[in-house]
Structure formats: C-alpha cells, structure tokens
Amino acid sequence: MNINTVPELIGRGSASITPGYMSGFKNSFETEALPGALPIGRNSPQRCAYGLYAEQLSGSPFTAPRGSNERSWLYRIRPSVKHSGRFAKADVGLWRTAPCHEHEMPIAQLRWDPPPLPQHEQTFLQGVVTMTTAGDANTQAGMAAHIYLITASMVDQAFYNADGELMFVPQQGSLRFVTEFGRIDAGPGEIVVIPRGVKFRVELTGGPARGYLCENYGGAFTLPERGPIGANCLANARDFLTPVAAYEDKDTPTELFVKWGGTLWATTLPYSPIDVVAWHGNYAPYKYDLRTFSPVGAIGFDHPDPSIFTVLTAPSETPGTANIDFVIFPERWMVADNTFRPPWYHMNIMSEFMGLIYGVYDAKPQGFVPGGASLHNMMLPHGPDREAFDHASNGELKPTKLTGTMAFMFETRYPQRVTEYAATSGLLQPDYADCWTGLEKRFDPTRP
C-alpha cells in the first residue's frame, strides 16, 4: 500500500526496529506495518483487517479550517480506552506547569550554567527540570522551557502529555523515541516534535543525554509564512521527517504515565500501548535537522530582525504575534558593509529563553556555553557584551563565516517566570549582568 512501509522489519513484540521516515511537513501521510492493514476509501470499516480497532486522534476541533485541521486515523491492536486503568498520582519531580508562582519573577537578565548529568540512573520522566513557565496550560496558552537529563532508557513504560505539544532539542547524546506512530532517532543538531496526546517512550542510543524541551500549551507548531522571501529558504517542508508505522504486540506489564492538568498520573497495563499497526493523517510526530535550515540575511548593510531565523511558530489568536517562535542562529556568512554585525541592543515585547547546542554565540563569546541557558524577559534590555561590542565595532569588515555554532531561542508573548529550581539550584550566574559594566560612555559632541 505504501512505498515507505518496511514490513520485513516488523514483528511481534519488535524491540529493535530500524526507523524509516516519510518526507514532508504535516502531509496527509499513510503507512502500514502489515500489508492491507489500512482500509481503502474509508476510515472506519465494519471490520478492520487483522482484527484491529479504528481510532481517531484529533489535534484540532472538528470544525477547524482545513488548513489547520489536524487528525490521524490509527489502526491498533487495542483501542486507547483499554489503556486507561485506575490512575494514581505519580511523582512529577522537578517538572512544573504554568501558572507556577513558586518563585518571584526577578526584574533581571538571567543566565545559567549547564546542569550536570547525574551519576545515578534517571529516565526521561525522572530527568525533566523546568526552568521557566509562561501563560496558563489550563487556557491552552503559553509554554514552559525545560532541560532534560537522561542516564537510563524507559523500559516497559510509556507516556503522553495532555497539557501540550513537546519539542525536544538534543544537546548531548542521542535518543530514540518509540512512539505509537513509529520510531524516531535524533541527536544534537536535530529537533523532535511529539504532538499532544501521542504515546511514546524515550530510549538512550549512545550514552547519557542532555537537551532542552519546550512544552507548548497552545496551538501546534507550524511553518512560518515566508512573505516576500518567496517559495524557498528557511525551513523547507521536504526536510521534515515523519516515521513509518511500527508496532509492539507485547503482553508485558507496562506503566503508562499521563501528564494532565499539571499533574503526573500513572497506571499499569498488562501490555504495551505502542500497538498501532497502520495509520493515516496529518497529526503525527516528526523530526527536523536544523543544519538543513537555509538562512537569509543582509547582503548589503544593516542587521535584519531575528525573525528571519524562525524555524517553527505556534501562532496565537493575534495575527503576527506568536504564542511561541522557535528560532535558531546557525552557521552563516556575515557580509554586511558599514554595519555592526552582531545582534543589536534591544528591548522587546516578547520574552526570550535561549540555549546553545554547540559552538559559540556571536553576541556572547564568554559565559554562554553549550547546555546552558539565558532568559531575557519582556522589556528588559539585552545585547552584546563588551568583548563582542569592541570586536564588532573595530574589526575589519571582510566577509566572515560563523562556523560550528547552533544557538536557539524559545520566544513567547508571555513573561516567563523562573522556577524554584532555576533560581536556587546554584546554576544561576550571579554576575551575568556584569558583562555590560565595561560598556563605557563614548559620546563626544566634538567628534562626529
């Protein structure tokens, strides 16, 4: 039925399936792990092939406009109603959900050192630490910025998030996401997006892992409009990859965790819920290699706005104002003439949480390191430090390529509140604001 199907890799209780992918961004995909598992010309036949159950997973209201209507039909061994046992509260650890007021919101620019990986075994669910929250998950608005620290795979466990969509940004170590839609492998330089309500587990594929995690409480991430840029560049739809179907038919006791209403709930099932044999639709997890992003920029003079580096946007109800923008600062050429080339000094209506995947960020060559983070909340000034300013103001303006660097930003319309962990863990750099103390008065009315 589908040229991307790899049935020879699928088996009962398969645990080591090689991931396969379909190209495109939120296409109407179809994929089956067994031939004939997908019904033809209908969604819900009287009897599904192989004794499967038909189930729809909706990521938008039924009446959403066609361009933003998201749903998939799943053909699975057991319907999800069989995945609901008697839930009990589980330890949510350091994962926090907005609104979270456990610490006051400081009027200051903030920067953190990378959190160290623990020496003990810690799975994904145990290793999420929240740095900031914004908005209100109950009203489906805002976001949270987390860091994950993983030293052990999830075994006989599954999880889904009812509160929001999850974007993983690996910084160290590679991960395998075993989802009910299929398998996804990803490492530093890639992102993975898991929609709200999709069951999955996280496995290590090569040593401990650390990275960033954006929890999007609002509308789903989508590609930004290009406007006058035209039909090409930025993130191209063909570079997004969605997994082909892969299932588990395992009668092994499995813990199912659900994040719902800011609380983590758990139940035990007598089988694996990762049991989708075939599916079709446009609501599915995907990954994207950030190194395929084609940046645009100034080829004459001046420094354009950072919005030109937007990879994905989660829009709000106000046109042009994002609930979240995911922005990257990748390798690129700097060629603008008679121009201060680093990001300029700025006060912004949006609130910016930044991280560094690898390399050096051109506006902050010192102190902002891979695995670390910074927060510049709305209307708090920020910009290059003294070293970056002096170098950019006096250096030779020859074409220069920034290489080996990948920084990113989660930008939201809502102020971001720091958590107790972010404020008191010892990672907060107390002298961050000192990076601007060396910026002295340069004004001389006698020298134009």
Swiss-Prot record:
EC number: 1.13.11.5
GO terms of molecular function: homogentisate 1,2-dioxygenase activity; iron ion binding
UniProt entry tagged with the keyword Oxidoreductase: yes
Secretion signal, residue range per the UniProt entry: none
Pathway: Amino-acid degradation; L-phenylalanine degradation; acetoacetate and fumarate from L-phenylalanine: step 4/6
Entries under SUPFAM superfamilies matching the protein: RmlC-like cupins
GO CC field: cytoplasm
The UniProt record lists the keyword Oxidoreductase: yes
Catalyzed reaction equations: homogentisate + O2 = 4-maleylacetoacetate + H(+)
Residues the entry annotates as binding homogentisate: 361, 382
UniProt keyword list: Dioxygenase, Iron, Metal-binding, Oxidoreductase, Phenylalanine catabolism, Tyrosine catabolism
Binding positions for Fe cation per the UniProt entry: 346, 352, 382
Function: Involved in the catabolism of homogentisate (2,5-dihydroxyphenylacetate or 2,5-OH-PhAc), a central intermediate in the degradation of phenylalanine and tyrosine. Catalyzes the oxidative ring cleavage of the aromatic ring of homogentisate to yield maleylacetoacetate.
Name of the protein described by the UniProt record: Homogentisate 1,2-dioxygenase
Source organism: Rhodopseudomonas palustris (strain BisA53)
Gene expressing this chain: hmgA
